[in-house]
From Swiss-Prot:
Keywords noted in UniProt: ANK repeat, Repeat
Official protein name in the record: Putative ankyrin repeat protein RF_0783
Entry-linked Gene3D superfamilies: Ankyrin repeat-containing domain
Organism placement in taxonomy: Bacteria, Pseudomonadati, Pseudomonadota, Alphaproteobacteria, Rickettsiales
Organism: Rickettsia felis (strain ATCC VR-1525 / URRWXCal2) (Rickettsia azadi)
Placement of ANK repeats on the sequence: 64-93, 136-165
Any Pfam family matching the protein: Ank_2
Amino acid sequence: MPLSNNQKFYIAETVEEKALCNAVRNSNVNEALSLILKLIEANQFQKFNGDLRDRDPEETYYEVYYPLLSVAVLKRNFKMFEMLLEYGFKPHAISSGLNPETTPLIEASRCGRGDMVLKLTSILNKDELNYYDKDIKNSALYYAIKNNHVNIFNVLTSMTKGVDVDFEVSMEVTIISSNFNLFIHFFYNALQGIQDEVLRKGYLLQCAASKKIYK
């Protein structure tokens, strides 16, 4: 049975929880830190910011109080962003306030925040990246290409080595972008993970042909 609108996100119950949500939205780092420490002292922090990795991924984003990490990204507040990460707000567990199916990784790429992308990818391991659908990685890559953020593009493509990536989606995004430099870079970087030389050449030929069509 589908969840009703008022069931999709738990509501912050205590004064501290509501205040923390407001502090993050208002970019008040000092107040947010003070409230987090109060939650920890009252033994409420784990309940408020539980580790959701063991839950059904299809239900995970319904079981988050508030998308605080994504809000910090959208506010471009790196200090708040770092503080939330330090206190355990997991990037794979906190969904976007605008769309519950996106993550801070996508938001950071969309906002052009290379520092945030680098920070997120440095703490995400292979298992955590594969915990969500691979479209998340491709969506982050899409925004990097669309906005011509070469540094973010480089971080994301190096991150995909050894990780299951939908190459067809990534190829299409790179081709449509009509950014030839990124197009070439992608296939000599991300496709290094394909050991079969014939398969790798096949991808390159397919993309070269597609590039001509799109031109």
